[in-house]
């Protein structure tokens, strides 16, 4: 039987994969993907713990995170499209070209 430890290990591994993607990548789109992987790893952990302690708070919090992540993707992809139209690149290094 798959227990709480298995879910938490998978959650931790997914979070580490997302964190490694955030630290290694220079592409904005891949940074968004890494962020989504990290958020989904947190959701798996919340849902596993809430199922283990028989409390729905973790599941409700995971649903809230999914809603926030959806709005983040909508706004973020719009900004990425504008970024690509202006700089013809999705590299973070072109961020230095912005003046404000």
From Swiss-Prot:
Q: An example of a Gene Ontology BP annotation on this entry? A: ATP synthesis coupled electron transport
Q: What is its main location?
A: membrane
Q: Where in the cell is it found?
A: Cell inner membrane
Q: What is its EC number?
A: 7.1.1.-
Among InterPro entries, the record links this protein to: NADH_UbQ_OxRdtase_chain4L/K (IPR001133), NUOK/Mnh_C1-like (IPR039428)
How does the UniProt record describe the way this protein sits in the membrane? Answer: Multi-pass membrane protein
* Molecular function per GO: NADH:ubiquinone reductase (non-electrogenic) activity; quinone binding
What does it catalyze? a quinone + NADH + 5 H(+)(in) = a quinol + NAD(+) + 4 H(+)(out)
Q: Which residues cross the membrane?
A: 1-21, 28-48, 64-84
Q: What does the subunit section of this Swiss-Prot or TrEMBL entry state?
A: NDH-1 is composed of 14 different subunits. Subunits NuoA, H, J, K, L, M, N constitute the membrane sector of the complex.
- What is the role of the protein in this entry? NDH-1 shuttles electrons from NADH, via FMN and iron-sulfur (Fe-S) centers, to quinones in the respiratory chain. The immediate electron acceptor for the enzyme in this species is believed to be ubiquinone. Couples the redox reaction to proton translocation (for every two electrons transferred, four hydrogen ions are translocated across the cytoplasmic membrane), and thus conserves the redox energy in a proton gradient.
What the entry lists under PANTHER family is as follows:
NADH DEHYDROGENASE SUBUNIT 4L-RELATED, NADH-UBIQUINONE OXIDOREDUCTASE SUBUNIT ND4L
Family note: Belongs to the complex I subunit 4L family.
Question: What name does UniProt use for this protein?
Answer: NADH-quinone oxidoreductase subunit K
